[in-house]
Amino acid sequence: MLNIRLFIFALFASLAAAPAVAQEAQTLDEKVNAAFAAATGPFVNFIFAPFPGTIFPWIVMWLVVGATIFTLYFGFVQFKFFGHAIALVKGDYSDPNDAGEVSHFQALATALSGTVGLGNIAGVAVAVGIGGPGATFWMILAGLMGMASKFTECTLGVKYRNEYPDGTVSGGPMYYMKKGFEELGLPGGKFLAILFSIFCILGSLGGGNMFQANQAHAQIVNITGEFPGWITGVIFAGIVFAVIVGGVKSIARVTEKIVPFMGILYVGAALVVLIVEYDKIGWAFGQIFEGAFSGLGVAGGLVGALIQGFKRAAFSNEAGVGSAAIAHSAVRTKEPITEGFVSLLEPFIDTVVICTMTALVITISGQLITDPETGRFVLNEAGTAITTIDGNTGVALTSAAFATAFSWFPYVLAVAVILFAFSTMISWSYYGLKAWTYLFGEGKAQELTFKIIFCVFIVIGAAASLGPVIDFSDAAIFAMAVVNITALYFLMRVVRGELTSYSSRMKKGEIRKYVG
């Protein structure tokens, strides 16, 4: 374990030093980036490589196949218990005396704040820009199936969590890998837990931190003009530290307010655009269904639309990655399965609602150029993407789409992006923290050490050119899914036992609403 700890410290030091040292000279910047890319490139290429004989990334296929298996294994649990999940979030069955630190709603808000982010804005724009509106259909389908993955991992997160005398808890994939495998007499659980924790820490510092700070700074620059990145980083680091220093209860108090606000802000803005362009909504849905099954006039045809939809859903809602199980494990409950029900709402809100709203706005806005004679989308010269007005992609495409309703809407979008980035950072700080304390032990000193490291990386992310560092951290996040889903296959029978027991007691009337 000591060697692992030394390795992790050395790796973090190199990650922090690379962008910082690169500020001294452009030639040194290039050398550092090239060296880091050469060292991490094989790992990144492996994670995002296509499945043999196809153009479908194997990691996306891994997530989709897992979601499909869990959907079938648990008898479409995401549809059968959807209503019950809403009742749980409302607090109808919540006993405040149960072990745990946060309510069902707070746990859901914390997990949602980690998934609802730039992927819903920039990622969907990329998916629709390449795969056309038809990608939206496959995105929704993947989101619906991903609900079963969230249900599985979050049930296990609560079942195998550690509960401490002071009322705090620690849970997540690393705990159910170790304790669950031991309970079933299976080998390898401890190894999987360590591997998952390493990937989780790397992902939290990269994709859950530096990338978010970098993109938030870009939006601030768009609004104000030139603005020093390090100042943005210091401001964000100070605000984030003020929130995370209080632990998961502090994070939950913030996310339970900011998540509904930013969700209403973004969805409300999208609804305004849809109302203004109401006469095009029917046409937009027609484009979605036609594009999903014909794929005509889009890059890659039908397969291209399917790949982009599945990829965006997987990258956006993180179903199967295991991160959400860390947040949900802090819930106050004596029934692990109840938090599994609550968690299945995440992919629905993130992908089926918010991502779909983004796709609809882009589709009806007229930003995707069509041939007036055929009505088909016009591809670029390389045939790799749909031509857009002014050549916009990513956040710029979504911003331009919103601006078709009101010219000042891009400012609303910029605020939404900044809020999404902030909420993602505070949630991923908790994920990384729990992985850190799993490896280095529980304690205030260990927790403070990670929180300081996390905030330092915020400044680096806002001020530096990230390049290969972000590619590596993104790969680390999806490497979490490889480890996590492997464990879920071995432990899903435990979840089915919990589901069978709870369903039986519900039918007998033994599961009653809480009356204080």
Predicted regions and their residues:
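Flexible loop linkers connecting adjacent transmembrane helices
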Residues: 76-104, 126-128, 132-136, 148-187, ...
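Transmembrane alpha-helical segments of multi-pass small-molecule transport proteins
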Residues: 60-65, 140, 190-198, 222-246, ...
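Helix-loop-helix module between adjacent transmembrane segments
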Residues: 70-71, 113, 142-169, 178-214, ...
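Membrane-interface loop-to-helix entry segments
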Residues: 3, 65, 73-86, 196, ...
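N-terminal alpha-helical transmembrane segments of multi-pass membrane transport
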Residues: 2-118, 128-133, 146, 489-516
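Alpha-helical membrane segments and immediately flanking helix-loop junctions
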Residues: 97-130, 156-159, 165-180, 195, ...
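Extracellular/periplasmic helix-exit of transmembrane alpha-helices
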Residues: 153-166, 270-287, 300, 330-333, ...
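Extracellular loop-to-transmembrane helix junctions
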Residues: 52-81, 129-167, 355-357, 409, ...
